[in-house]
Design a protein with these regions (language model features):
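Flexible, glycine/threonine-enriched loop-and-boundary segments that flank and lead into catalytic domains
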Residues: 7-32, 36-40
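A structural signal for short secondary-structure junctions
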Residues: 24-25, 32-34, 49-51, 134, ...
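Beta-sheet entry/capping signal
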Residues: 30, 38, 139, 147, ...
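C-terminal, non-catalytic macromolecule-binding modules
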Residues: 37-114
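Auxiliary tRNA-acceptor-end handling modules of aminoacyl-tRNA synthetases
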Residues: 95-96, 110, 143-145, 151-174
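A conserved acidic, glycine/proline-rich C-terminal tail/linker
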Residues: 116-140, 144
Length: 174
């Protein structure tokens, strides 16, 4: 994993106005990059039309390689990332429960109980380039999200397709 000058993080890992107990990146806050350094958010850029945050600027502490500070300071959050120089766009399909109730067979029409959010398709996801290597296998863990299987029949070399097969426990929902 190569840390370069431009990284991608999950949108949920940054907040311009964080709530209490938010242990991820925010203006003036320091977090640990998983397998990397401590970084501190110095500024961010928003899209003038939508207000959406499109860039987060940070400084890093070169003395914290490996995620530990020689001065003993601690950070409360660790976020994962992917280097912009070492990633590709992918389509990711997230599956949820098919029905909105536990026993759909007890209803007159089970079709009324289908969960409209049982499939979420996420396009333009960033994944490491290793997924393009045919010798790397077809099953991957995407940190904090779960285990995914590469769809070699419906995906493409340019934009691989992944299906989530198992979720991980959501420790962020506490």
């Amino acid at each position: 994993m190569c840390i370069r000058d431009r990284l991608y993080i999950e949108r949920d890992d940054f907040s311009e106005d964080p709530p209490a107990k938010f242990n991820r990146l925010a203006p003036g806050r320091e977090v640990r990059l998983r397998y990397g350094y401590f970084v501190t958010c110095t500024s961010f850029v928003t899209n003038p039309e939508s207000g959406e945050i499109i860039e987060v600027h940070c400084t890093y502490d070169p003395d914290t390689k490996g995620g530990y500070a020689p001065d003993g300071r601690k950070v409360r959050g660790t976020i994962h990332w992917v280097s912009a120089n070492n990633c590709v766009d992918a389509e990711v399909r997230l599956y949820d429960t098919l029905f909105t109730v536990e026993k759909p067979d007890e209803s007159d029409d089970f079709r009324e109980l289908i969960n409209p959010h049982s499939l979420e398709v996420v396009r333009n996801s960033k994944v490491e380039t290793i997924v393009l290597d045919p010798n790397s296998g077809n099953t991957y863990q995407f940190e904090r999200l779960g285990y995914f299987t590469k769809d070699t029949e419906n995906g493409s070399e340019e934009v691989p397709l992944f299906h989530r097969s198992v979720t991980l426990r959501d420790t962020w929902a506490r």
